[in-house]
Swiss-Prot record:
Name recorded for this polypeptide: UPF0229 protein BH1031
Coiled coil: none
Biased composition (Gly residues): 103-113
Source taxonomy: Bacteria, Bacillati, Bacillota, Bacilli, Bacillales
Similarity comment text for this entry: Belongs to the UPF0229 family.
Source organism: Halalkalibacterium halodurans (strain ATCC BAA-125 / DSM 18197 / FERM 7344 / JCM 9153 / C-125) (Bacillus halodurans)
Region (Disordered): 80-117
């Protein structure tokens, strides 16, 4: 460029490769997947892929509200209509969908001639679902009890000392100390640095008291609990255990399975083994009271019994159940009863509980898979939500 020229030139470098475009498309797609997960959370929570994953970090789940992009052929072969600058008014019908009255994909027994629904199968981490589900949940009526556990919440570096680990050296304060000492000795500057100039950051553990709690998970495993009923109950308890272990460090969980008799079982047996026989729900409540008397003093523990059944209890046992539920509530922060009743049939147990007015008693009837999510929201809703 000639001397004295007034023209200014700016050399810029921009990434015009396809890699940048691909990254933007990928990020936009991930945002769409997350939005679809939020909208479909009630259905996704009870997906069999999740419940049977044994807590694996990443799983594949179908998201039916997110289409798989592809070229579709127009089978109607009709001429299409556009809207121009004519004399049309708001509300005028400009065209009708010729396929509006046709039969779509359904769930009937006969064979159809329509294409099925396309859906996107996304890889989702359990942690993502937990973050969305657990953010609105908490143990209700959690109170401070005797002999609370002290839990280390975090570490604070809030003190400076002359002795410590070299990994915790405070460089800024060490340099300032050396400069001040050298200046007082008439040698302005940083060097030399002596051991007496070294400053180290030290920490304190910030602890908070956390009340102890125990959840008594009771499940009906009798013959009347079919495969779907047991799957729904186990789906709820699957998310309940993950919720408790994610948000609370001092919560014990006891697993009780019952038919006509109740017994304390391991977590693995609770989620995998099936049984048969009749149904006497009071046996589970008696076993829960035994555990409370033997191991969980109400003065030291917040107690939360949860019972899931299909409601098909021995009629003569309902009065005993009602009496034992009252006894459990006297020592509990909340009692939760979930009933898996897909076809709204008559339930002898829910009929006995319908007049319970104690605020510590909460119940929910599960009729479809999405009700697992709604039951979690009912039993573990936050206090401000409960008040409002």
């Amino acid at each position: 460029m000639k001397k004295g020229s007034r023209h200014n030139f700016v050399v810029s470098q921009e990434n015009w490769t396809l890699h940048r475009k691909g990254y933007q498309d990928q990020r936009r797609h991930q945002e769409k997947v997350k939005e679809a997960i939020r909208k479909n959370l009630p259905d996704l929570v009870s997906e069999e892929n999740i419940i049977m994953s044994n807590g694996r970090e990443v799983i594949k789940i179908p998201i039916r509200s997110l289409d798989e992009y592809k070229i579709r052929y127009n089978y109607d072969k009709n001429k299409h209509v556009g809207q121009g600058d004519g004399d049309s008014q708001v509300g005028d019908v400009i065209a009708r969908d010729p396929s509006a009255g046709q039969q779509g994909p359904g769930k009937g027994q006969g064979a159809g001639d329509q294409p099925g629904e396309d859906y996107f199968e996304a890889e989702v981490s359990i942690l993502e679902l937990e973050e969305l589900l657990f953010r609105e949940l908490e143990l209700p009526n959690l109170q401070q009890k005797e002999e609370d556990h002290l839990v280390v919440e975090h570490i604070e570096f809030n003190d400076i000392r002359k002795k410590g680990l070299m990994g915790n050296i405070d460089k800024r304060r060490t340099i300032l100390s050396a400069i001040k000492r050298n200046a007082l000795e008439g040698r302005p500057g940083l060097i030399p640095i002596y051991n007496d100039d070294l400053r180290f950051k030290t920490w304190n553990e910030v602890v908070r008291p956390e009340s102890k709690a125990v959840v008594l998970a009771m499940m009906d495993t009798s013959g009347s609990m079919g495969r779907w009923e047991k799957y729904m109950a186990r789906s709820f308890f699957f998310w309940m255990t993950r919720f408790l272990r994610t948000k609370y460090e001092t919560v014990d969980i006891e697993f009780i399975a019952h038919h006509t008799e109740a017994k304390v079982v391991s977590e693995e047996d609770f989620f995998s083994k099936g049984e048969s026989g009749g149904t006497i729900c009071s046996s589970a409540y008696r076993k829960a009271l035994e555990l409370i008397n033997e191991k969980y003093d109400p003065a030291r523990y917040n107690i939360y019994p949860f019972h899931f059944s299909d409601g098909d209890n021995l009629t003569s046992d309902n009065a005993r159940c009602l009496k034992l539920v009252h006894e459990l509530m006297e020592s509990s922060s909340m009692f939760g009863y979930g009933e898996v009743n897909q076809y709204s049939r008559h339930s002898t147990l829910m009929n006995a509980y319908k007049n319970l007015k104690d605020p510590r008693f909460r119940s929910y009837v599960l009729k479809e898979k999405g009700d697992v999510y709604r039951a979690m929201k009912t039993f573990f809703k936050k206090e401000e939500e409960a008040v409002s």
